[in-house]
């Protein structure tokens, strides 16, 4: 119970300082980063200690004390430590401390520095409390705290209307899921009379043999619990808040997508897995929602230009893989992918923050420009360390061995094919799409040449770079490919002449270039970030390279007794399950693994190759092949293919028209209903009342 409380002293101290000695606290604001990192480091030590206990003893520790007691009702508060909790504790604390270190450099010039550290520390505390909860009502309490912190951080730059709108959108969308979760909790309490996990699981085991509980009611309550996870983990159809959540600072985007907000939904399903697995209809629904989400997220990421939104849709798709794995009963594969994806995605988001940081001297603090991949390109020459780490993170998410995500995604794909060819086909095809859009992000950001000199760029179809979209870099004729630095007479970028000034949130970094003659001229150019931002990238790169090996089979030393190979993760997660197989099947399993791996890697390589053809250096080569171009132009199918490309691009760039549908049907529909209600209330109800009074008055006067 100590682990969730460790960050609280720092939060309280910062709040006390801001309230009583605000000037001194703000002047010494960067000092507060040290105790935040220190206390979270202590939490890591405790988490690792508990994990070692779980590996060696494989026992569950539970301590409860009474929270509210009367004659009929007792509400208890405690903690539950098991392998699932141990995994989440290590994941949250390691990613959390790296994000804190990164934030010290990223937010150093922001006036909301202290407020950001208060929010992010409380965010970590809430998530730690959630994963150590021992009952449903305790989970719901921390569930709401996690949501509150995420809303505060999404709308951190609240002076920007778009950030405030994104905060509101996340709040409203998650209200749907949270309300369903609350109803599900109350429903299961009414059915079972308990909120403790151990009691729920015991009763769930007796549902099938006894048939003493209404199956329709239990299915409905389980669906309501699942609805909470759908909203939190941005699953279809409650996924619309996640891309807009990128309006918050980049470090919190990394934390939300790796170890906190969206991971909470997956954790809830994993925690209640013994309950859901006893209801086959809900398991089918979980796998179906996961399949739809993983494919939808991949298609929506194909044509995005904002680097963070592209990664957000990638997260949505990967969470769909986890949902699919849980729905088909592949508990270990889902948690394995949760671990590997968390470190790879944290690396990618923090890397994107480094890219944005390097673009700001050129374009000013304007997310529409600093996060726009259309204006990037050629950054590998200016930020080589960021480029290297981002490339490894990209290849990991694409499923290239031996990187982390390869092992977990390959396991999910294999289990999907075994469960249903329908799920296997969609999951495998989406794996190819994942490789395509992830390598597209890398190529648009780091390959080629710097495109920031497009002074007349706009996001409309008439814009000069509108054609840099889904289908490759069709370069305008007026492009200077030898352009390196953008310079004006004042020594700053042309974009900086019209920088949107945001109160309290601006960061002005102008690079300085000294000539050999001693004269100092100011240029705007991309530059590598500081050590406090590079250090977390290198640590996350280490995890991305090696964390996948916990899922690789190893010899447990008992092959002579007919015991097959195990994995460290399976030994940790399911210590009580007999995982032994005949040694004669070991070769078959190895053969199947190699076959499945070749298939998944081939799909990833195809996706990488297509992305390189359309966005890489090879694009210009293929454009210059006159024979192929003339053949294509004369082909009667050209018009058909162009129309198909436009349809796919419009679908992807416009987010599948889902946001438009929600706006027109729900937002405008509810507003129309409220206006109708207002008219009925004031015009009819009040009119009748006032009319009766007026008639009575006239009669009385007469």
Swiss-Prot record:
One of its GO terms (biological process) is ATP synthesis coupled electron transport. Keywords: Chloroplast, Membrane, NAD, NADP, Plastid, Plastoquinone, Quinone, Thylakoid, Translocase, Transmembrane, Transmembrane helix, Transport. It holds the Pfam family Proton_antipo_C. Its EC number is 7.1.1.-. GO terms for molecular function: NADH dehydrogenase (ubiquinone) activity; quinone binding. GO terms for cellular component: chloroplast thylakoid membrane. It is an enzyme of class 7 (translocase). It is found in: Plastid, Chloroplast thylakoid membrane. InterPro entries: NADH_UbQ_OxRdtase_chlpt_su5_C, NADHpl_OxRdtase_5_subgr, ND/Mrp_TM, NU5C-like, Proton_antipo_N. The chain crosses the membrane at residues 1-21, 31-51, 81-101, 117-137, 139-159, 177-197, 211-231, 250-270, 272-292, 319-339, 346-366, 388-408, 417-437, 534-554, 602-622. The keyword Ion transport does not apply. It catalyses: a plastoquinone + NADH + (n+1) H(+)(in) = a plastoquinol + NAD(+) + n H(+)(out); a plastoquinone + NADPH + (n+1) H(+)(in) = a plastoquinol + NADP(+) + n H(+)(out). It is a multi-pass membrane protein. NDH is composed of at least 16 different subunits, 5 of which are encoded in the nucleus. Belongs to the complex I subunit 5 family. NDH shuttles electrons from NAD(P)H:plastoquinone, via FMN and iron-sulfur (Fe-S) centers, to quinones in the photosynthetic chain and possibly in a chloroplast respiratory chain. The immediate electron acceptor for the enzyme in this species is believed to be plastoquinone. Couples the redox reaction to proton translocation, and thus conserves the redox energy in a proton gradient. This is NAD(P)H-quinone oxidoreductase subunit 5, chloroplastic. It comes from Poa pratensis (Kentucky bluegrass).
